[in-house]
Swiss-Prot record:
Transmembrane segments: 1-21, 52-72, 81-101, 123-143
Main localization (coarse): membrane
Membrane topology: Multi-pass membrane protein
Keyword Transferase included in the entry's annotation: no
Coiled-coil spans in chain: none
Organism lineage: Bacteria, Pseudomonadati, Pseudomonadota, Gammaproteobacteria, Pasteurellales
Keyword Membrane included in the entry's annotation: yes
Annotated protein name in UniProt: UPF0756 membrane protein NTHI1233
Places the protein is found: Cell membrane
UniProt keyword terms in alphabetical order: Cell membrane, Membrane, Transmembrane, Transmembrane helix
Amino acid sequence: MTLQLNTIALLLVILLILGVLSNNSAITISAAVLLIMQQTFLSSHIPLLEKYGVKIGIIILTIGVLSPLVSGKIQLPDLSGFLSWKMALSIAVGVLVAWLAGKGVPLMGEQPILVTGLLIGTIIGVAFLGGIPVGPLIAAGILALLLGKI
């Protein structure tokens, strides 16, 4: 087996290092898996990840978000809780964020080079600003809004 030293491999190594330095396991694991896939016989499966990866990731994320409700750790509020201004605002923010993320996915497909910038920005936000790495889709939606794609 020979290593393929190219710009994508270098980018994945940089993302791997940044993921480790920023204690971002999602970036670290993702970069490591993709680097291993790129450098081995598994490279033939990368198109499957490209086609279904975001959809599978959203499904897993949704399962993770709904799990505390199913396990009973989070209770549904009573009717008065649903009618409060805080609940109305949280629903509105949830709708806005879901809409933005929905607009970000096509932008990421149309201009995949922007994904690199979004990931670097996410890593910087996690490493230096105490952020949490859940924002690339929403960041892409905000970018689409700023670029006039919406």
